[in-house]
Amino acid sequence: MQKFLTTAPVVAAIWFTLTAGILIEWNRFFPDLLFHPM
């Protein structure tokens, strides 16, 4: 349990960083799809 408590924040931080980076890159190449998905 102690290992989970120490690794969970690290995994969450990496996951949020990757998600934000993917969204930023997607918005840079396809700026209209985020605002007009249909």
From Swiss-Prot:
Coiled-coil portions: none
Organism lineage: Bacteria, Bacillati, Cyanobacteriota, Cyanophyceae, Synechococcales
Keywords: Membrane, Photosynthesis, Photosystem I, Thylakoid, Transmembrane, Transmembrane helix
Originating organism: Parasynechococcus marenigrum (strain WH8102)
Primary localisation category: membrane
Keyword Transmembrane among UniProt keywords: yes
Keyword Nucleotidyltransferase appears in the UniProt entry: no
GO BP terms in the entry: photosynthesis
Gene3D superfamilies named in the record: Single helix bin (1.20.5.510)
Record's protein name: Photosystem I reaction center subunit IX
Positions of transmembrane segments: 4-24
Record gene name: psaJ
InterPro entries: PSI_PsaJ, PSI_PsaJ_sf
Membrane association type: Single-pass membrane protein
Subcellular location field: Cellular thylakoid membrane
Family: Belongs to the PsaJ family.
GO CC terms of this entry: photosystem I; plasma membrane-derived thylakoid membrane
